[in-house]
């Protein structure tokens, strides 16, 4: 080995040049479509926007969407097809920054900047900032880093003008998707100041009196994602109205509860005045309403917020009567299970703040309260922070399992999934109705109801059904996306941030791992959803409630994530999905033996951990093969059907012929000596009645 080769090895014996090739494999990959302005994104885990085909009028995700909307050189899953370097360079001129519709040319750039890659020597290049992304480009080595500004959690200056150490003066960018990026600037020229100012301005638009980039981004998708979900249509799909449940529009104009949808299902016996009283007894006015009804037993899942019983144990007769209506609506069981997502100690502590939980005694043993021990948003936020430190940038092989265990992330995933399964057992096994709530009913409650519905109803395991599930249980019922994920706000230490929705998607992935053919969508679909949870490219996850999205006119002014997904469905379909009748209700095993860390998502920025398989490309190839095989099977079935029909006709003709022949003999016997007018024996027979 010569000296140059020796220098390329790190302490662990890993070839740095090979690692850089892995990180910049985007130069040898191309994601089935062109990037912005017909230009592909060259980073195989690159920026999270739709890549635009201006000729076809469609948008397909580049690797940015396939492995993540926020992307980096360290790449995520390897999701691209392949093209040689010459083709890539023809499609991506290195003297330009690829732009999305509505994205402005670089507002600021700085040359001679070094990206301090944790897996390679510093890479020198040029950094650009647009109104949507941070874009770093190096020619030698050929390398691109493309990160949507919405994914940034905080931006900090490192070092001072007096700093003498090399690469000690620059900017650190900490992202919401488990990674951090560092750039070293030259001290002369004040390039750091200008880049920092523009990056801060557009990464945190609400803090700088600007709108989200989603209001600038316009693309003519083939599908209208905003039309995926209609509240009344979904309730009718579930069978409403019935004798015991009705579709209620009492919340028109969001007068009853400003974090609920305008339309929801309530017991038929509950009139509108009762709804007002019950809403007044529930936190935030979030009264019990229908999430799902069993098509056969009519057992239901309803959701709400905690009752306002306080330390004095207040009662509300209308609320008690309302819950009795929910019980009585289910003729197969007279018992209502109240699933409180919180640990008991937390529920008791909430009494001091005016909240609390239901008293079983007032329901004459017809209600049972069960505490599911799911911890609050603060515990979950800290757990994810610890996990991010374990996964990026350095991984300790000798302590990997213990480090992951110490984050307690998988413990929380097990607990959430276990709670959802308990709901499923009560609804499906015991045929009983279940009421679910936590404190305010928009975090843990959404996790539990949506997961239980996913396990109970095969419709929600289809590509569009899962979109309906998210729109219904998360968006319309007021999960606070803006607050929980810090959209557009420069306040990374906000204690109200928490990965609640991320945990739901993680739980979905866990179930997919146990039932490979039960889901129409694939893992890439889940990663894409999480990437655009942060990207601010689409209006789907903006703001805290349906009411605010309506006030901001989000449906008219922004694109829906589902528009992009449904216009490029092949990227998100599971080739193993079986459409023939199968087990309708899923019962996954929520134990540590079966629950795994989702490395494709949490570890994708670490080249030592990410999958080297071209999963999306393989999935599309399998879909094509499946369609070919399905076509062959359909043709074979048609041919068999035709042959069977011909055989049946032939047998029928043969039978008729034999019958006619036998009938003719009888006629001849009965008319022996008879002859035709021509003197010949007659061969004409009377019709045979069969």
Which sequence ranges carry the predicted segments?
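Short intrinsically disordered, low-complexity coil segments enriched in acidic
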Residues: 1-2, 80, 179, 497
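Anionic N-terminal interaction surfaces
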Residues: 2, 7-43, 48, 52-128
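Phosphoinositide-binding peripheral membrane targeting modules
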Residues: 108, 114-170
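Conserved N-terminal structural segment that caps and organizes enzyme catalytic cores in eukaryotes
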Residues: 120, 145-148, 159-171, 179-424, ...
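Acidic/polar residues in short coil/turn loops that connect beta-strands
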Residues: 130, 175-177
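A phosphate-binding catalytic loop at a beta-strand-loop-alpha-helix junction
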Residues: 302, 427, 431-454, 508
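Catalytic activation segment of kinase domains across protein kinase-like and atypical kinase folds
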Residues: 447-468
